[in-house]
Amino acid sequence: MILRKLFDYLIFIRKYNQFKRNATLTGDDYKFGRASYVSISDGSSKADVVISDHVWIYGALQSQNHGKIHLGKYTKVGVDCKLQSVESIIIDDYTTMADNVVIADNNNHPVSPSFRLYMRTTSDTDDSRRWKHSAHAPIYIGKIVGLVKMPGLTKGS
């Protein structure tokens, strides 16, 4: 029992430090699942991902090209959830996401068929594969919202 608590505490400290390195933590009392993470790339910085008080994260927060992600107070991001931003995803206070929710403010791929054809001929690290080349629009989810398992919310929602 004591070893389990110690192990859980060490996992929390490790996750807390990973999140602190890649996101702006503006409060306290966080819970991070073992598979949770923040990914910032293509010019994004920790200032682009803001996590408020009493937030539970069991999924992934992904920002590219300065895409903003803001999680309000007492928000829960369920297991295997993905928030993928190249523009802006704002989740207001007291919102809960069940497991396997995907929220993407972009199409993850270019709209133009000719650009997609070009993209398919490049390496998986090529700039053409970045979300900034896809259609994108901000997403705002208000206060006290519950998102059910496996919905997909896309740009402009």
What are these regions (language model features)?
Residues 1-111, 122-126, 131-144, 148-151, ...:
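Domain-scale signature associated with acetyltransferase and cell-envelope carbohydrate enzymes
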Residues 114:
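Unchanged
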